[in-house]
């Protein structure tokens, strides 16, 4: 049976999904053990699910490739058709690459990675490399550095430990075992993974012996390897870009285990101290007012922020913080923030120069599938508007978050409408999100001028005088 370790803000909901689909939960936290009444297992996981450190609100799945795909399918069956990204090659895979120009190596047809130490090799050379980074810019090392359940081979003759290994006795034992055999790795070293903290000294020695044998076996394969042959599979990675609807599903699943407000997981994306959330959910258990208390907590979060972060997440995982911006208004789900723009360049989609004193007012309705940026000059003249189409806007503890859906509309100062990046819709890796973007675009494009004018009127009523020309 596949063994899964679950960590992060979605742990309770994901543990329930994994258990329902027959996976074994290993290395669970005390909270998860208590909530699900399961036995503690220290076995190493085949797959780990955790928060993605680079993409706010996303899941990061890593482990044995065949098992990662199964776990991904289990999650998608519950949360629906969401965007996810898989690197072209596994992490720590060992591949017979072909050295290319400009410091790169081709590790699969058309797939280039930066080659560490590229000055020592010539274009056309065949070279076994280990993929040491597969998210963002691919990077390959000319050292043979496979990974196992308990350790990873590294490119310097040292013994290192995962930061998750806390026990002093375990640390001393693992260092001792590592140093006793490190000379058998031919100039390489090891980094013990967190699962190694549960090993006895005898089992740690066996784990290291197996890693040494693995390195030697890979070296034997090199002589007969062809271009792009994978000499060691490594670990597959998937980043799952969760949007509001997926998070709401996970809120509901968690609510079957412990009282959970709607919006729980969005709030926790940037929440460091969960005491107020815990107390609110205690009240949910007592008063059964789940939706009302969830809205109240979201209102509390936004009402108490003087600056707002706008987490603009793209379907490829790129994260852009459009803040922090000054909160100038929040009431009944309507949030308005102000950002001063740096002079230089042009306003997105409008081809209008950004000048000294320009500002952007972002008009954000929580739960809506778009938000509008109103651009004004130093004297309050309307310079244009940019309407971003996105997934429903959610409240985080430090602002708001949404997934950008590529296509947008602009309205210039003469109230002429332009659709931009419509051709990028097909690049979204989710049919559901494409359909939602097309529906929102269709709904907006006939009414976007009225939408922008209404927003300008709203800003004027708040004392933010904005003037424009035109009918």
Curated annotation (Swiss-Prot):
Q: What does the protein in this record do?
A: Probable RNase involved in rRNA stability through maturation and/or degradation of precursor rRNAs. Binds to RNA in loop regions with AU-rich sequences.
Recite the lineage of the species.
Archaea, Thermoproteota, Thermoprotei, Thermoproteales, Thermoproteaceae
Q: InterPro entries from the entry?
A: DUF402, FomD-like_sf, Ntdp-like, RNA-bd_FAU-1
In the record, biological process GO terms are: rRNA processing
Give the record's keywords alphabetically: Endonuclease, Hydrolase, Nuclease, RNA-binding, rRNA processing
The record's gene field reads fau-1
What are the EC numbers?
Answer: 3.1.26.-
UniProt-recorded Gene Ontology molecular function terms: mRNA 3'-UTR AU-rich region binding; RNA endonuclease activity, producing 5'-phosphomonoesters
Q: Does the keyword Nuclease apply?
A: yes
Q: Which domain of life is it from?
A: Archaea
Entries under Pfam families matching the protein: DUF402
**Claim: Heme is one of the keywords in the record:** no
Q: What class of enzyme is it?
A: hydrolase
Query: Per the similarity annotation, which family is this?
Result: Belongs to the FAU-1 family.
By what name is this protein known? Probable ribonuclease FAU-1
């Amino acid at each position: 049976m596949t063994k899964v370790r679950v960590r992060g803000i979605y742990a309770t909901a994901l543990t329930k999904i994994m258990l329902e689909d027959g996976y074994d939960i290993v290395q669970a936290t005390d909270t998860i053990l208590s909530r699900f009444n399961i036995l503690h297992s220290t076995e190493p996981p085949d797959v780990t699910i955790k928060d993605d450190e680079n993409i706010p609100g996303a899941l990061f799945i890593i482990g044995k490739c065949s098992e990662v795909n199964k776990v991904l399918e289990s999650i998608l069956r519950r949360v629906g058709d969401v965007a996810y990204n898989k690197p072209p090659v596994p992490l720590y895979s060992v591949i017979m690459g072909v050295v290319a120009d400009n410091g790169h190596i081709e590790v699969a047809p058309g797939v280039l990675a930066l080659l560490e130490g590229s000055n020592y090799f010539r274009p056309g050379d065949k070279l076994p490399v280990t993929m040491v980074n597969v998210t963002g810019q691919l990077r390959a090392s000319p050292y043979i550095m496979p990974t196992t359940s308990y350790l990873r081979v590294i490119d310097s003759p040292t013994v290192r430990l995962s930061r998750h290994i806390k026990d002093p006795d375990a640390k001393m034992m693992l260092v001792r075992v590592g140093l006793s055999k490190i000379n058998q790795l031919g100039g390489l070293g090891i980094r013990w993974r967190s699962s190694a903290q549960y090993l006895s000294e005898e089992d740690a020695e066996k784990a290291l012996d197996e890693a040494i044998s693995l390195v030697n076996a890979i070296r034997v394969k090199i002589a007969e390897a062809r271009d792009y042959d994978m000499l060691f599979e490594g670990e597959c990675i998937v980043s799952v870009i969760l949007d509001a609807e997926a998070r709401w599903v996970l809120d509901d699943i968690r609510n079957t285990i412990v009282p959970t407000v709607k919006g729980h997981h969005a709030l926790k994306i940037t929440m460091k101290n969960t005491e107020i959330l815990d107390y609110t959910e205690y009240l949910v258990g007592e008063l059964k007012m789940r939706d009302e208390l969830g809205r109240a907590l979201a209102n509390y979060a936004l009402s108490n922020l003087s600056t707002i972060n706008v987490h603009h997440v793209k379907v490829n995982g790129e994260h852009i913080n459009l803040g922090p911006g000054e909160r100038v208004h929040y009431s009944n789900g309507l949030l308005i923030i102000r950002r001063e723009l740096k002079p230089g360049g042009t306003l997105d989609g409008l081809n209008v120069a950004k000048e000294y004193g320009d500002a952007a007012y972002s008009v954000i309705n929580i739960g809506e599938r778009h938000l509008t940026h109103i651009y004004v000059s130093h004297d309050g003249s309307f310079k244009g508007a940019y309407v971003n189409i996105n997934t429903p806007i959610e409240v985080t503890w430090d602002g708001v978050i949404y997934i950008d859906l590529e296509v947008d509309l602009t309205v210039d100062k003469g109230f002429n409408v332009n659709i931009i990046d419509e051709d990028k819709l097909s690049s979204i890796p989710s049919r559901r999100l494409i359909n939602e973007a097309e529906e929102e675009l269709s709904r907006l494009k006939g009414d976007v001028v009225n939408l922008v004018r209404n927003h300008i009127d709203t800003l004027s009523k708040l004392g933010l005088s904005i003037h424009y020309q035109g009918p």
